[in-house]
């Protein structure tokens, strides 16, 4: 369960090579705890993490769990923010003080210093596909970014996408726990 998932993420993170870990055996708050423990290791090593959650799941309670663990190091980005608030968060991230960025799909493009980990929670969610121009699938962009920046990518889902399951079967840099 949780221990195995955290160990697999730790190994992927330490490889610095864009490895992907699909976490599909842990549900509910257990999955969030896996993310939090993995992020703790990343932050301790001086690197940063981006955590993407579906817009509908980006609740004050979700943010509070991350702030409870990482305090003032947490930045939040979502579509309901005003321009000023978004700018302030962007600036906070760019400064390097924000080590944990929690947000919806667009948070993937935040100017994060020293990216060590990207987490996509509920990776099967349709909201991660951008249908208007420029079109992209968040998972694919995140996998590319992880490779480019020597980070690890974690995909969390109780119902993984067929694409993710296929990659686990056929790509040695992808594992499932």
Provide a role label for each language-model segment.
Residues 65-73, 77-101, 115:
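Conserved motor-coupling elements within RecA-like helicase/translocase cores
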Residues 31-40, 142:
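Motif I (Walker A/P-loop) of helicase-class P-loop NTPases
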Residues 17-20, 38-62:
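Conserved SF1/SF2 helicase motif Ia
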Residues 25, 104-105, 121-123:
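Walker B catalytic acidic pair
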Residues 117, 124-177:
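Post-DEXD/H (motif II) to motif III coupling segment of the RecA-like Helicase ATP-binding lobe
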Residues 1-19, 33:
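N-terminal pre-P-loop "Q-motif" helix
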Residues 101-117:
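Conserved RecA-like ASCE ATPase "motif II neighborhood" in helicase/translocase motors
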Residues 28:
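Walker A (P-loop) phosphate-binding loop of P-loop NTPases
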């Amino acid at each position: 369960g949780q221990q195995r998932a955290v160990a697999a993420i730790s190994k992927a993170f330490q490889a610095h090579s864009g490895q992907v870990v699909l976490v599909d055996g842990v549900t509910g708050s257990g999955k969030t705890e896996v993310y939090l423990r993995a992020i703790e290791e990343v932050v301790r090593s001086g690197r940063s993490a981006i955590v993407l959650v579906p817009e509908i799941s980006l609740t004050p309670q979700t943010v509070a769990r991350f702030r409870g663990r990482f305090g003032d190091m947490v930045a939040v980005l979502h579509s309901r923010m005003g321009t000023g608030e978004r700018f302030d968060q962007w600036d906070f991230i760019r400064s390097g003080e924000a080590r944990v960025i929690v947000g919806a799909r667009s948070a993937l493009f935040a100017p994060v210093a020293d990216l060590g980990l990207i987490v996509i929670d509920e990776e099967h969610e349709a909201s991660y596909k951008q249908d208007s121009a420029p079109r992209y699938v968040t998972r694919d962009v995140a996998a590319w970014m992880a490779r480019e920046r020597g980070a690890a990518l974690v995909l969390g889902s109780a119902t993984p996408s067929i694409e993710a399951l296929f990659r686990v079967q056929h790509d040695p840099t992808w594992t499932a726990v």
